[in-house]
Curated annotation (Swiss-Prot):
Protein name: O-methyltransferase penK
Sequence positions that bind S-adenosyl-L-methionine: D285
Coiled-coil stretches: none
Listed GO biological process terms: methylation; secondary metabolite biosynthetic process
Keyword Lipid biosynthesis: no
Function: O-methyltransferase; part of the gene cluster that mediates the biosynthesis of penigequinolones, potent insecticidal alkaloids that contain a highly modified 10-carbon prenyl group. The first stage is catalyzed by the nonribosomal peptide synthetase penN that condenses anthranilic acid and O-methyl-L-tyrosine to produce 4'-methoxycyclopeptin. 4'-methoxycyclopeptin is then converted to 4'-methoxydehydrocyclopeptin by the ketoglutarate-dependent dioxygenase penM through dehydrogenation to form a double bond between C-alpha and C-beta of the O-methyltyrosine side chain.
UniProt enzyme class: transferase
Associated pathway: Secondary metabolite biosynthesis; Alkaloid biosynthesis; Mycotoxin biosynthesis
Pfam families for this protein: Dimerisation, Methyltransf_2
Protein keywords: Methyltransferase, S-adenosyl-L-methionine, Transferase
Family of the protein in this entry: Belongs to the class I-like SAM-binding methyltransferase superfamily. Cation-independent O-methyltransferase family.
EC number in record: 2.1.1.-
Amino acid sequence: MGSIDDSFSLPAPSDEHGFEALGTQLVEAMSTYAKCLKAENLPPPSLYPMFSASTSVACPEGIEAKRKIVELSQLICAATMDPELNLLISSLQFHFCSSLKVAIDLRIYEYIPVDGTVSLSQLAELAGRIMRVLTNKHVFMQIQPGHYAHTRMSSLLLKTKAKDLLSHRLDDVFRSASREADALAQAGYREPDRRAAKGFNLAFNTDKNFWEYIATDDPKRGARFARAMHAVNINSLDVIPRLYPFDSLATDGSLIVDVGGGQGQVAKRILEYYPNSGLRCIVQDGYVTNGSTAGPAAVEMHRHDFFEAQPIKGAAAYFFRHIFHDWPDNACVTILKQTARAMDKHRSRILICDQVLDDNSPAEASLLYDIDMMSLFGGKERSLAEWKSLIYSAGENLEIVNVLRSPESEAAILDVRLKL
């Protein structure tokens, strides 16, 4: 671990970050956001489930204002709260996670009508204690003492995909995270590598990585994980075809190899979005059977381990969605090397669809996803500087020539080519 530079000192508080100035900035951001919502005929933010579960503005000003509201609110709370109490409450947040898991396991959300309330007497005594924690976090609301109703958050639990994602996080990830500190200590507090034990290994008492474990030891857990991934909003299927002009690949041979592409859901969406482009897609995954899918957006399915030599040479694009963030740097270098050796230097590119963390103010969700990846896989979310360092360390004459970012999130596609 590096030594502390004694010459470093915190900057003096400025008027811009003064307490009242923060409040002024918050009011301004709320005003801007409200105007954008009104202009797009969207309802104002509310906890009530009758409003849209997701209030997403399209205009850049509204997106930025929404980000500022959340960021400033958290900053004001952190500055206002007693620091000892703040640390204490923060250290107890795992109880919220366990309470939420109990509510999901008991399916409490099914007993509450969407447009009504349920009394505590209709719930188990234990559930009442759990509900106190969850209403404090506005997952549910207490209309009057002992009577509970849905909020926009709890109403999401009525949707299977959201429930599966939360169940995965509150079980697989929660258990893994509880042992991550032990795993890091065991590794001497070094960056995880492919061979080091992760929090997952200690929590589940296995030498297998997560992927091997859910494929062989616990396929039921693996099926839930697959369902959960359909509920992830970062790099959603609808965003991907709009992030990159895939139809332009027609001039470079038209072939897209979707590496680690699961059942081909991304490849199919790309073909559906560009129906007359002449594109072809081959989906490679370690757990598929060789063959082809049916329908107008048909893709070829090939079994392949991306740590082995890439058998398809000179494709227009080797596409990786949510692959690199699952693996530590040394594993990613192996994947990049195997892919680069199959590329044609004039027409091939590697397209990496993952998060690119903002250097100055990364989203809180992205920072937590980073620890998520570390606990389960030893992976990480990366800033642009970290992506550049990773690509450079792979050698093979690779370089990032473009980064196409989503205006709505930290999702992005990195366009990586061979230097000419």
